[in-house]
Amino acid sequence: MIISQRPEWDETFQEIARIWASRSTCSRRQVGAVVVKDKHVIGQGYNGVASGKKHCVDGGCPRGMLSYDEVPAGADYNQWPCTSLHAEHNAILNAGLAACAGATIYVTDKPCQQCTNLIEHAKIGRVVIGGRGIVSA
């Protein structure tokens, strides 16, 4: 058997992040993240609530109870708390903070400011955002 097109490592790990994103139970968006060091996955995660808690899609998230269109005009969307952790946070927790130094994190969407801060705190050396190229942390 001849392999005509073998995916690059970045493509491979980004696909793994996409698979993790599909596990998300958020009613608004599905995001996945994978922390990789020396071509080995050391942590993975998706946005979601803690194990054993009521999932967002099952009505467990106060923020997810309203669609964007249902939020009253002039109201701050952030007044309703999100009860889940973001994919990046879950992946770093799964890897262990100390293990993340110098690693690469693959995410399916651009990290928010809090996740960017966490990525920097974890000393992750490289961030790869799905479909958007490579961005240094």
Model region roles, listed by residue range:
Residues 1-137:
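Zinc-dependent deaminase catalytic domain
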